[in-house]
Amino acid sequence: MMFLGVINKHAPLKKKRIRNKKSPWLNAGIKRSMIERDKLKSTAIRTNFSEDWSNYKKPKNRVNNKIKETKTQYYKEHFRSNSGKPREIWKSINEVMSRNTKNDSNINSIKTNAGSTTSPEVMSETFNKYFTEIGDKLADKLPDSTKIYSDFLLPVNSTFQLRQVSLAEVLKLLKNLPTNKATGLDKIPCRLVKLSSPFIADSLCNIFNMSIISGIFPLEWKVAKVIPIHKDNEKDELNNYRPISILSAISKVMERLVYNQLYEYLSKNELLSKCQSGFRHSHSTTTSLLDATNEWYANMDQGNLNSVVFVDLSKAFDTVNHSILLKKLSHYGLHAETLKWFNSYLAERRQQSLVNGYLSSAKTIKCGVPQGSILGPLLFLIYINDLPNCLKHSNPRMFADDTNITTSSKSITKLVQFVNTDLDNLNDWLLANKLSLNVTKTEQMYIASDNSLNKISDLATIHLANKQIRRVKKSKSLGITIDERLSWTDHIDMVSKKVSSAIGGLRQVRSFINKETAITIYNSLIQPLFDYCDIVWDSLGASQAKRLQKLNNRAGRAICQLGYEVRSSLIRSQLGWSTLEDRRRKNKSITMHKILYGNSPTYLKQCFHYANSGREYNLRRSENLILPKPKTEYLRKSFTFSGVKVWNSLPVYLKNQVSLSSFKRELTSLSSYNY
């Protein structure tokens, strides 16, 4: 409060009405010229003399040219300053295209038990009650379990205790605070915390260390401001909103200090499951999907059927049981003093919901990891860390709460039996850990050859908790649409649709921006659509690859403002682009470098082996990797096969580049990689 008092004294908040300028490029000189132009137009209309019309047309053209010039300059600077910020770039594109995409955060009405209401006070209280009670209500609906959480835990022999933090650690975090984050209920902006960091770091360091020593997390830091954000469907339904929690900036600095220590301990002792790819260094959606597709292709190469269950957990982050979480933290080696701190961190958390400017009263949150926090995601990973231990016949892959479970067998009868057995085991684990499965959103898909898929009977059904899991022919996982034949047709359809829309936007704004800005838009909005997990679906068919390349050529024509009479190869040369196929090859090479030089998950490292395994590891990066021997074309489509082929084709000097940045630089300089 003392810090806030100083802020209020020297930088008091002042209310100011902000009127958005509809045309900020219209300067005073242009406005004066517009007035003169309009006067001449009025005269010409009144007299209808050809001389008056001629006198009007010349200044009209001058004004229009000047407006176009200043508008172009305005957007050029705007796009340049917002490079790497897709949201801001899209906002500007929508302005130029006159598309009404205003995201109104106001909520007109919601349905309550007493009927529909438009009162901000009632709506804020209703949302707050809904968000704080949803976890408890889901837990109350769960049936009793025959097992307990500890039945699935494996022994741990390491220990962890929070140490006191140094002034250097605190100062570093304060100086790196992002200044664009919303302000919490303590009303202390991140920007002011960052600016005053040299003067407050020592005091904050003492406060943080007092918290660690005493095992008490300050109560004032445990209250969140929650803003309901509409997701989709009806706007008056509570369950169509997600809560955005805003916490104190200073509390998040404290959390980051603790997070760094805990994450280092878990990583050093390899306590986090190898199946988990969410919120972890060197892990990503791409690595998780590569691991999955590698297994699916390998199974198909052996003549096996794959069954994949895409599990949907109901409000998983909101339903974490605090008692079980603390016991699991103890199991993973946290000392009593450290456990006391985490208990204080979780206990007595409150939140207030803000709707249309009205802030609700505070309500206590009894379960779940703190939303919007630094520690919340890591605590969730610890909570579900032992999930893989419940499965006997299947391989799970987790990205936070996004989970898929793969089972394989040559026999459909055995496969169904194995899947159903493991789903029973999964249900036991969920009940023991007081988590709920959303059966209606959980999907099951067989992935196999056409011949094998045709032999699967409709009677080969999968069940969980006596409820049938819906079988699908395609499913979206981690932003990628996966189909039962791994043809990638549906995913390419989705990418093509998004790219076409983005190119349309680029074409409409092109006349207002220069070539450099157009390239910035391409790099921010279009190229990422082609790049996202591209090495996962790189086994796409020739016609699909051609379809994507044509779209990229269209984007190049829009940037260069050239027609179809100009060859695509000339446009790519002008822009310094390679083909998308070469770009995917480049991305695959970079991923292989990360794997072989230790910057990737264990599950990918173990897929690759050097031909001469007798030499010292640090001397054989330049040697070739062992190329798997496929029985069918399926294994040839896998990353374990194509990745080896790409790496082995690289020059020795390039494979010897230890630094990833040096590797990328040298890779780009090769004639076959022009990007």
Enumerate the predicted regions with their spans.
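Conserved pre-catalytic core of RNA-dependent polymerases
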Residues: 131, 160-370, 407
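Short linear motifs embedded in intrinsically disordered, charge-biased segments
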Residues: 113, 117, 543-675
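Basic/polar low-complexity segments
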Residues: 2-23, 46-165, 454-463, 596-629
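Short, conserved micro-motifs composed of acidic
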Residues: 160, 421, 436-474
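Basic, alpha-helical interaction scaffolds
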Residues: 1-2, 392, 467-536
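Catalytic palm active-site di-aspartate
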Residues: 184, 223-226, 242, 276, ...
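Conserved, non-catalytic sequence blocks in retroelement Pol enzymes and Pol-derived host proteins
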Residues: 22-29, 46-54, 81-82, 119, ...
